[in-house]
Amino acid sequence: MIKIADFTLFFFIFVFSPSLPLAQSQLPDLDPQDKASLLIFRVSIHDLNRSLSTWYGSSCSNWTGLACQNPTGKVLSLTLSGLNLSSQIHPSLCKLSSLQSLDLSHNNFSGNIPSCFGSLRNLRTLNLSRNRFVGSIPATFVSLKELREVVLSENRDLGGVVPHWFGNFSMNLERVDFSFCSFVGELPESLLYLKSLKYLNLESNNMTGTLRDFQQPLVVLNLASNQFSGTLPCFYASRPSLSILNIAENSLVGGLPSCLGSLKELSHLNLSFNGFNYEISPRLMFSEKLVMLDLSHNGFSGRLPSRISETTEKLGLVLLDLSHNSFSGDIPLRITELKSLQALRLSHNLLTGDIPARIGNLTYLQVIDLSHNALTGSIPLNIVGCFQLLALMISNNNLSGEIQPELDALDSLKILDISNNHISGEIPLTLAGLKSLEIVDISSNNLSGNLNEAITKWSNLKYLSLARNKFSGTLPSWLFKFDKIQMIDYSSNRFSWFIPDDNLNSTRFKDFQTGGGEGFAEPPGKVEIKISAAVVAKDELSFSYNLLSMVGIDLSDNLLHGEIPEALFRQKNIEYLNLSYNFLEGQLPRLEKLPRLKALDLSHNSLSGQVIGNISAPPGLTLLNLSHNCFSGIITEKEGLGKFPGALAGNPELCVETPGSKCDPANIDASQEEIYQNELVEGPISIWIFCLSAFISFDFGVLGIFCSARARSYILQTKA
C-alpha cells in the first residue's frame, strides 16, 4: 500500500442514528434474562479501571452504559466506549434480544467478531472501532436486516474481502466505516447500488480495482490510501449531496473531469498522491461551498486554475494545496481574492514571475509555501498584511533583494525559510521581535555582516541555519545560548577567531530520539501548527513541519582558530559534529564522551598529538573523517580504524598499523597517505553525502550536516 509522505486527510462525520425510545423518569427494573447475560459478560472480561463496578442491583439507572425499555426492562442500548476493557467477547451478549445499539469502541477487545451477533435481529448501530479484532466479517451479519450503521474502523488485523452480499443484507444501511483495517479485493457491486448509503469510509486498506460510479446520493466518500486504479468517475447520482470526496493515495490516472463541477455541495476534495495529469480544464468551476482543495502530488500541468476564486466567495476556501505538480506560469492574482484562505501551498512546481504584491490581502493566511519554483523579484512588503502568518516558506526560488525590516510585524511566525535564493544585505535587527520563531533557515543566499545578540530573543528556536552566506566577524559568545536549540549550522561563511565556550555548560542539546532523559518527546525540528477554520466550525487544520534531522552543530568551512572547547564534547546528545575546513589546533578529545555521535568530521584542520582511545567507541558512529591534520604516533586497526578506511589519511606523522604492516616508531613517514588516498571522500561534502544517503527519500531535500530533510503534513479533520 502506498505510504503517505507528506499530506494525510482524515474525515470523521457521524450520521445520527434514529433516536432510541426514551425511558421515563421512573426507570424499570432490568429484565432478569438480560441481567444474567450482562453479569456473565462482566465476569468474562478484564476491567482494569473497574468501570463496570456499578453493575449490581435491579434498576437500569445503576448500570453504566445501559438504556432500557419501559416497561419491559429489556436492554436497548449498551455503550461501553473507552473504558479500557479487554478480552474476547463472550457470546452472552448475543442473548440481549432487544438490543438496538452496541458500542464497544475504544477498548482492547480481541479475537474474532462473534458470529452470534447475527442473532441480534433488532440491531441498528454496531460500533466495534479501535479494538484488536481479527479475522473477517462474520457471514451471520446477513441476518441483521435493521442495521443502519456499522463501524469496524481501526482494527488493523480485521479484513479479508468485503462480502459480496454486504450491500444487500440491510436496505436501511446508511453508514459503513471500515477504515484503517486490512480489507482487500474490489468493492462489492452491491455497495454501489445500496440506495440508503450516505457515508462510506474505506480509508487505509488494501483494496484494488477500478472505481465505478456509485448509484446513490452519498454525502461522504473516503477511499484514500488504497490501491484503486483507473480514472475518476463523475458521481452523477451524488451530485445533489456529495460533500466530502477523498480518494488520496491511490493509483488513479487521467485528467480531472469537468463533471466534478456539477457536485454543488462539495466542500472537501482531496485527490492528492495519485497519477492525475494533463491541464485542468478552464471550464471546470468548483463548488461555491468548497472549503478544502488538495490536488498535490500529481502530474497536473499548464497554468494554475484561476476560476477557483470565482465560485468561493460565499463561504470561502480555507486550504488550497496544488503542490508537487508541474504547473507553470504566474501565480494568478485571483488567488489573492480568496479572503478566507488559511493555507496556500504551491511548492514544487514550475511557477515563474513575482509573488503577487496583493498577497497581504489574505489576512487569515497562516501557512504560505511557495518553495521550489522559479519565482523572481523580492519578498513583497504587503505580505505583512498576513498578520496571522505562522509559516513562510519560499526557499529554492530566484528571489532577490533584502529582508524587509517590516517583517517584524509577523509576530506569530514560527517558521521562516527563505533559503536557496539570492537575497542580500544583513539580518534586520527588527526581526529580533519575532519571538515565536522555532525554525529559521536563511542558508544559501548572499547575506553578509556580523551577527547581533538581539536574535537570542528567539527563545523558542530549535533550528538555525545561516550556512553558505557571507557572514563575517567572530563567532558570537552567545552562539549556544538558545535553550531549545537542536541544530546550528553556520557553515561556509567567513567567521573567524575561536569557538566560544560560553553557555556550553548550560546548554544541553535535547534528546529527541527517545523522548526520555532531559529532552522532549517530540522529534527534532518538529513544529506543529493547528488552524481552526472559522468558516466551518467543525474543521481543524493541523500543519506539521518536520526537520527530519539529528541533533548537531556545523561550523565547517570558516576561518576558526584555537582549540575545540572541551565543553563541546560534554554535549551527550549531539549526533553530528562538523568542524572541518578551519584552522583548529590542539588534541582530539576522547570520542567516548559523545555516546550518541553518528558522524564526526574534523578534517582539514591543524589538530595534533596522538589519537587516544577507540575512535569507533560511540556505537552509532557511521562516518568519521579526521584526515589532513597533524596527528602523530601509532594507531592500530584494533582501535576502531578498520571501520573507517581513509579516516586518518593526510596525517604524515601518523602510522596506521595493520596485520600485514607494522610501524617502526623511529621511521614514521607519509606512506600511509598513499594507502588511503583513493578511499577518502575529501572536503566538507563527505558528511553531506552520508546525510544524503540516509535521508534522500524525504520531501524537501537535505540541509547540511544535520541531514535536514523536510517533511510536512497537515490534517483536515471533520469532527462529529
Swiss-Prot record:
Residues 1-25 form the signal peptide. InterPro entries: Leu-rich_rpt, Leu-rich_rpt_typical-subtyp, LRR_dom_sf, RLP23-like. Mostly expressed in apices (e.g. shoot apical meristem and flower buds), and, to a lower extent, in flowers, leaves, seedlings and siliques. Also expressed in the inner tissues of the proximal root meristem. Expressed throughout the vascular cylinder of root tips. LRR repeats lie at residues 96-122, 124-144, 146-168, 170-194, 195-217, 219-238, 239-263, 264-287, 288-311, 314-338, 339-362, 364-386, 388-410, 411-436, 438-458, 459-482, 484-506, 547-571, 573-594, 595-617, 619-641. The keyword Glycoprotein applies. Pfam families: LRR_1, LRR_8. GO terms for cellular component: endoplasmic reticulum membrane; membrane; plasma membrane. It is a single-pass type I membrane protein. Disruption phenotype: Insensitivity to root growth regulation by root CLE peptides (e.g. CLE8, CLE9/CLE10, CLE11, CLE13, CLE14, CLE16, CLE17, CLE18, CLE20, CLE21, CLE25, CLE26, CLE40, CLE41/CLE44 and CLE45). Impaired interaction with CRN. Stem cell proliferation leading to enlarged shoot and flower meristems, as well as alterations in the development of the gynoecia, flower pedicels, and stamens. Reduced sensitivity to CLV3, CLE19 and CLE40 peptides. Ectopic fruit organ initiation after floral meristem termination. Enhanced resistance to nematode infection. Residues 26-686 are extracellular. GO terms for molecular function: peptide receptor activity. The keyword Metal-binding does not apply. Changing residue 178 to L: In strain: cv. Bu-0, cv. Co-1, cv. El-0, cv. Gr-3, cv. Ita-0, cv. Jl-3, cv. Kas-1, cv. Landsberg erecta, cv. Lu-1, cv. Pi-0. Changing residue 110 to C: In strain: cv. Landsberg erecta. Keywords: Cell membrane, Developmental protein, Disulfide bond, Endoplasmic reticulum, Glycoprotein, Leucine-rich repeat, Membrane, Receptor, Repeat, Signal, Transmembrane, Transmembrane helix. Changing residue 168 to D: In strain: cv. An-2, cv. Bla-1, cv. Bs-1, cv. Bu-0, cv. Chi-1, cv. Co-1, cv. Cvi-0, cv. El-0, cv. Gr-3, cv. Ita-0, cv. Jl-3, cv. Kas-1, cv. Landsberg erecta, cv. Lisse-2, cv. Lu-1, cv. Pi-0, cv. Sf-1, cv. Wassilewskija. It comes from the Eukaryota. Residues 26-92 are annotated as: N-cap. Belongs to the RLP family. This is Receptor-like protein CLAVATA2. It comes from Arabidopsis thaliana (Mouse-ear cress).
